[in-house]
Amino acid sequence: MSWTCPRCQQPVFFAEKVSSLGKNWHRFCLKCERCHSILSPGGHAEHNGRPYCHKPCYGALFGPRGVNIGGVGSYLYNPPTPSPGCTTPLSPSSFSPPRPRTGLPQGKKSPPHMKTFTGETSLCPGCGEPVYFAEKVMSLGRNWHRPCLRCQRCHKTLTAGSHAEHDGVPYCHVPCYGYLFGPKGGQPHPRHWDGMYMPEVWHVHGLWVCVDNFPCG
C-alpha cells in the first residue's frame, strides 16, 4: 500500500511515511512552509492545512501581534535564508493574513477556536474542552489533549504521527485498523475468539501475531 506525499507528489510507502495533518508524508518532505526546516509529526503548527514551525514562523505570520508564545515581549523574526533548491523568493504577499473573527450572538455554540490573552486555543476533538499550548499534541490536523488521542475502537492512547486514521478518526495500526479496514482474510486466534473482539492476537498473512506482549499459544 502506498500514498501520495502532499509535498513532492511521489508515492509514500509504509516504511518511510510519517503522518501529520491527516496525510502521509516522506519524513524529509514534512517542512515548514516558510523557512523549510524539517518538522516532527505532532510537534508543529498548522494554518490552512499547511505545516509551520511554531517559532518563529507561525508566531510571526499568524500569532497575536506583540505577544509571543510565552506571553511576554515581541516576536523577533529575521527572514529565512532560502534553501538551495528554492529558486522563487518568498514574500509576505504569498501568505494570506488571518481573517478577523466576529463575535457570536448570545446562546450560540462556541467556535472550534477561542481567543485568550496568550493567543489562540483549540477545542479538543476527544473531550470538547480547550487545549492550551503547553498540553497539546497535534494529529489529523487538529490539537488534542495527550490522553484524549486514543484509538476509536480499543481506546488505547496513541502517539501523534504514529497511528492510522479512517475518515478523520484515529485508530491503532494493529490490531484495530487492520481488523476494521485491512484486507479481508485475517481473523483472531481461535483460542481468543468467543464472539467478542480480543485484541491481543491477530492472524496476518498466514501468521499469528502477538500484540501488547501477550503470549501466543
From Swiss-Prot:
Keywords carried by this UniProt record: Cytoplasm, LIM domain, Metal-binding, Repeat, Zinc
Localization per Swiss-Prot or TrEMBL: Cytoplasm
GO molecular function terms noted in the UniProt entry: metal ion binding
Gene3D superfamilies the UniProt entry points to: Cysteine Rich Protein
Keyword field contains Glycosyltransferase: no
Record-annotated LIM zinc-binding domain positions: 3-64, 122-183
Region (Disordered): 84-112
Tissue: Expressed in most tissues, but not in skeletal muscle.
InterPro entries from the UniProt entry: Znf_LIM
A GO cellular-component term linked to this record: cytoplasm
Pfam families: LIM (PF00412)
Main location as per UniProt: cytoplasm
UniProt cross-references to SUPFAM superfamilies, sorted A to Z: Glucocorticoid receptor-like (DNA-binding domain) (SSF57716)
PROSITE patterns: LIM_DOMAIN_1 (PS00478), LIM_DOMAIN_2 (PS50023)
Superkingdom of this protein's organism: Eukaryota
Listed name of the protein: Cysteine-rich protein 3
Record gene name: CRIP3
